[in-house]
Amino acid sequence: MAEERSVSRIDELRQRIDDIDERLVELLSKRAACALAIGHEKKLIGLEVYQPSREAEVLGHVQRINPGPLDNEAMKRLFERIIDEARRLERVADTDEQAG
């Protein structure tokens, strides 16, 4: 009986994770669209894709607002990866404009 409750609770928690993952994908896609637009704007005004001060600002911000349970280093690593992908999209925007 306790085992059934535990299995049921695990299933419930997994469903919550699936729901959260769907929201994360949606939000990451919106963030990526913004990065692509930023890439276009940077190209228009001649800015470099890589902006170390902005990256430091973003990483500092996410660490300040981090409520846990992930520690700040884990959060930083996650956002470094997100930023890497955003930078890749900005470069794609730059390349697309040069090709077009």
List each model region and its residues.
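Domain-level signature for soluble enzymes in the chorismate/prephenate branch of the shikimate pathway
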Residues: 1-100
